[in-house]
Amino acid sequence: EIVLAMDYIVRSGMALYWGTSEWSAQELEEAHKVCREWKCVEPIVEQPQYNMLKRERVEKEYLPIYDKYGMGLTVWSPLNAGILTGKYNKGIPKGSRLDLFKDNGGLKGNIDEAGGLNEKTLEKVRKLTKISDDLGVKTAQVALAWVLKNEHVSSAILGVSKIEQLRENIETLKVKSKLTDDVMKEINSIFE
């Protein structure tokens, strides 16, 4: 049903392409199989959560999908609800997202699923902050640049609450070149 509906939408000119969100590799395989059998428009993008703390699906499960179907990724939560910005390294600041939405089960669930806000996670982020400081950039910029260095990531969905955060996020495009192979190895050794 989904394949037929999306095929109709694209062929009718209501959309140029279609994609999926949080589908498993098996579901993507099935969708492409149906599309090819029925000569329907295939999905071109998947929207998974992806960040330094949540990597398994993007880096392992989807590996056969990228080349086989030419799919890209539009990832969400590249900063894992702000944890990868470094702002929680010394506790939860007053007025921060985790302070304001501490009773939000969905937000808490996403954080817990990616390792949680605990000392082990915070120690990793503190090490990332040290790398960022050595590069002369913000921790959030390094975390975003790391996501964008993945050749399968077409774009990252960002959420900001302040204009300065948006500016810093845009500046990430200049930071990406600072993540040399050696820096990437150092980061990956922290978050493996």
Where are these regions (language model features)?
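Beta/alpha (TIM)-barrel catalytic core signal, keyed to glycine-rich beta->alpha loops juxtaposed to Asp/Glu
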Residues: 1-192
